[in-house]
């Protein structure tokens, strides 16, 4: 298969390239060349810009394209319309954030997506990100009706994830000592290893599969306590988990998902089913999940090498999520001293 990937050097795109090359496909990358341009020296690289700089794509043909870097419907529409007669199949990587709320447990792909009062908005914020992704989905499908695969991942984790939303916990548990853990060990969470997502997506592309698929995991109930216990086992650390109540965290202004990644207050009815998304359709289509310990082990190993990356230091080394050490100490002290 002759495959075009829009992006391809940061996170999911990187593993799509690796999976495609491992399966003997011919790969072409289209991006600005700003992130890890030294990767894949034998792969054709077309330089350009999603926003108005698509000239390098004109006059070419591929069997399929995977769009890993679309956030604005205008931009996705431009590439999809340009490629409509040049490719047989278009995959758009979307997000479960397209759903406006998660009040229902087990929400599947039939749930309505979010909308914007002003569909011309192009500022990507926490409020607009999901509806913009939904509009991107529509733009791709309109350009290639019946030939578009829409993948809606949940939280993607693993090596080369600079968001630190999962990496924070892997690193923090490995450091050992008393660790502030949110709420209680039994609350459910969902994640998907970037390599599992990439390999499944590629298999779907090979089959020219169309339609909409939620893609997170695993295929069993995973609790946050399971994640921390696995991190401790893999790193062989002496970490001690102090479970701090949700009420205390809210009262002390702890920011969900940012200061304490993965944690969403259960008191928010709109988020009740956030970690109970149905992925039955994707699993039936062949999505499989590696052992959590493998994800933790590989993430921990990669995190130890971040200083050696060719990414800019601000991106590579500056934590993007998680409690600052002094903030964690302060909160633990307040928790132990409460009356």
List the model feature ranges, each with a label.
Residues 3-23:
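N-terminal Rossmann NAD(P)H-binding glycine-rich loop of SDR-like oxidoreductase domains
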Residues 9, 34-88, 92, 98-101:
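NAD(P)H-binding glycine-rich loop region in Rossmannoid oxidoreductase-like domains
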Residues 26-32:
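Conserved glycine-rich Rossmann-like NAD(P)H-binding loop of the short-chain dehydrogenase/reductase
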Residues 78-134, 142-143, 149:
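Conserved Rossmann-fold NAD(P)-dependent oxidoreductase catalytic core, especially the SDR/UDP-sugar
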Residues 136-160:
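Conserved beta-loop-beta element that borders a ligand/cofactor-binding pocket
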Residues 164-169, 182-207, 211-214, 225-226, ...:
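Substrate-positioning beta->alpha
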Residues 170-182, 237, 273:
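A short C-terminal helix-loop "cap" of Rossmann-like NAD(P)-dependent dehydrogenase/epimerase domains
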Residues 204-280, 297-300, 307-339:
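Mid/C-terminal beta-alpha module of Rossmann-like enzyme folds, strongest
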């Amino acid at each position: 298969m002759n495959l075009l990937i829009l992006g391809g050097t940061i996170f999911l795109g990187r593993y799509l390239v690796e999976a495609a090359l491992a399966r003997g496909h011919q790969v072409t990358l289209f991006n600005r060349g700003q992130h890890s341009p030294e990767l894949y020296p034998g792969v054709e690289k077309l330089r350009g810009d999603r926003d108005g700089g698509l000239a390098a794509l004109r006059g070419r043909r591929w069997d399929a394209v995977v769009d890993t870097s679309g956030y604005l419907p205008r931009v996705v529409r431009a590439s999809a319309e340009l490629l409509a007669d040049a490719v047989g199949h278009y995959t758009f990587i979307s997000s479960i954030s397209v759903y406006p709320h998660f009040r229902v447990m087990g929400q599947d792909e039939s749930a309505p997506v979010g909308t914007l009062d002003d569909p011309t908005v192009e500022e990507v914020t926490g409020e607009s990100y999901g509806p913009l992704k939904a509009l991107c989905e529509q733009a791709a499908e309109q350009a290639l009706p019946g030939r578009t695969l829409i993948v809606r991942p949940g939280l993607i984790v693993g090596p080369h994830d600079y968001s630190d939303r999962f990496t924070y916990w892997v690193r923090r548990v490995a450091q050992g000592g008393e660790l502030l853990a949110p709420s209680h060990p039994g609350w459910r969470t969902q994640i998907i290893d970037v390599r599992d997502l990439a390999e499944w997506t590629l298999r779907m592309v090979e089959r020219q599969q169309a339609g909409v698929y939620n893609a997170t995991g695993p295929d069993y109930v995973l609790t946050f306590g399971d994640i921390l216990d696995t991190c401790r086992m893999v790193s062989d650390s002496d970490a001690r988990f102090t479970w701090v109540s949700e009420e205390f965290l809210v009262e002390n202004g702890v920011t969900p998902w940012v200061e304490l990644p993965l944690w969403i207050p259960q008191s928010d009815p709109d988020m009740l089913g956030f970690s109970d998304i149905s992925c039955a359709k994707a699993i039936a289509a062949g999505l499989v999940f590696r052992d959590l310990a493998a994800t933790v082990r590989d993430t921990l190993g990669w995190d130890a090498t971040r200083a050696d990356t060719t990414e800019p230091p601000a991106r590579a080394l500056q934590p993007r999520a998680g409690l600052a050490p002094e903030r964690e100490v302060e909160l633990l002290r307040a928790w132990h001293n409460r009356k």
